[in-house]
Amino acid sequence: MNRLTFYGLCLSGAVGMGLLVGSPICRPVFGELLGANRDQEKREKEIKILMAGGTIDPHHNHHDDHHDSHGHGHGKIKGHH
């Protein structure tokens, strides 16, 4: 096998792997391995609950906003003008 054929095979293999990773079929598998789907799945569950007429408890789902409102160093600083 000559060098040009080898580079062509490597390039096509790399492109093929990129397409597989980015495809909707394989994305859940790789996302689960990397932990990337947790937030998306959580948000999808919230949307389904809202569409079914349910409510979402903001104290469980917006933890950072809860901390901001109590002045843990992330909220607005009240001071002199």
Curated annotation (Swiss-Prot):
Basic residues: compositionally biased ranges: 72-81
Record field: compositional bias (Basic and acidic residues): 57-71
Annotated stretches, region: Disordered: 55-81
UniProt KW Secreted keyword: yes
Location, primary (coarse class): secreted
Cellular localisation: Secreted
GO cellular component, one term: extracellular region
Signal peptide (from-to): 1-16
Protein name (database record): Uncharacterized protein DDB_G0277453
Organism, scientific name: Dictyostelium discoideum (Social amoeba)
